[in-house]
């Protein structure tokens, strides 16, 4: 790869552990140790890459915060219009909200993902964002 991707926080390694929940290639660069503090990681998506619909469950607190640091991407909550994301945008995702996020078709995209502490937190991975939906953005 000749171009630098991942913004100031670096590309990281191929996100192989979660590849089955993504269309396209993504990369993960952990920024904190979740044993010591809240978990934060820089997640980078190649053009056209997006994760499946998913839900960050919690009985209290929880959810996720995305801080956009490089490129352009998309965020969408189930049943709502998609939101185009740019460097500097921040997305606060409440617990128990079905959503997806990823790169635009023609841009790499990186965001810092912050796991918001909560009680009884789990992640539920759902269906992929189909090509027809994505290509019509």
What is each stretch, according to the model?
Residues 30-32, 52-58, 77, 83-84, ...:
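Short histidine-centered beta-strand/loop micro-motifs
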Residues 41-60:
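Conserved short histidine dyad/triad with adjacent acidic residue
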Residues 48, 85-106:
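Conserved metal-binding segment of the jelly-roll/cupin
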Residues 50, 60-87, 97:
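A short beta-strand-loop-beta hairpin characteristic of the jelly-roll/cupin
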Residues 92, 106-125:
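A short hydrophobic beta-strand segment most commonly corresponding to one strand
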């Amino acid at each position: 790869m000749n171009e630098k991707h991942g913004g100031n926080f670096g590309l990281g390694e191929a996100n192989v552990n979660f590849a089955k929940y993504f269309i396209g290639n993504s990369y993960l660069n952990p920024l904190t140790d979740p044993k010591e503090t809240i978990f934060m990681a820089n997640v980078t998506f190649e053009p056209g890459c997006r994760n499946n619909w998913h839900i960050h469950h919690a009985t209290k607190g929880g959810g996720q915060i995305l801080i956009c640091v490089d490129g352009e991407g998309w965020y969408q909550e189930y049943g709502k219009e998609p939101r185009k994301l740019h460097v500097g945008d921040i997305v606060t995702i409440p617990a128990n909200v079905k959503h997806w996020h990823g790169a635009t078709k023609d841009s790499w995209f990186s965001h810092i993902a912050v796991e918001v502490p909560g009680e009884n937190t789990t992640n539920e991975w759902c269906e992929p964002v189909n090509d027809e939906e994505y290509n019509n953005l």
